[in-house]
């Protein structure tokens, strides 16, 4: 079973193991969205499960950049996906601010706009 199948099965035990698997999926989504990586699986199902676990497990800069991608490309996503990622960005802002120095000026502007709406 590969990491995508494990993630979708949601049967990984232990917080650290789940967090590690989540970060692998964040890397995968980052590559799909930012590097146009071709895939042979249902991206919608993977993205949906990623959103479900984002508030609990998301911490990396790639998770944050995936959030920014959704916000910048809102026309490509369902409305509730956009609301979910913005909500996670706001509710867990202290976690995401740990990456502030790594942000591009555009990403910092997106973060500012979302946190001040």
Specify the residue positions occupied by each region the protein language model found.
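Amphipathic alpha-helical "stem/stalk" segments
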Residues: 1-117
């Amino acid at each position: 079973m590969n990491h995508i199948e494990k993630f979708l099965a949601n049967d990984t035990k232990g917080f650290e193991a789940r967090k590690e698997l989540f970060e692998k999926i964040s890397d995968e989504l980052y590559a799909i969205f930012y590097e146009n990586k071709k895939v042979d699986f249902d991206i919608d199902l993977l993205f949906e499960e990623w959103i479900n676990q984002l508030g609990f497990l998301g911490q990396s800069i790639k998770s944050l950049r995936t959030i920014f991608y959704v916000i910048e490309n809102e026309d490509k996503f369902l409305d509730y996906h956009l609301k979910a990622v913005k909500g996670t960005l706001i509710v867990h802002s202290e976690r995401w601010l740990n990456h502030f120095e790594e942000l591009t000026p555009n990403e910092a502007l997106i973060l500012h706009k979302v946190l001040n709406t």
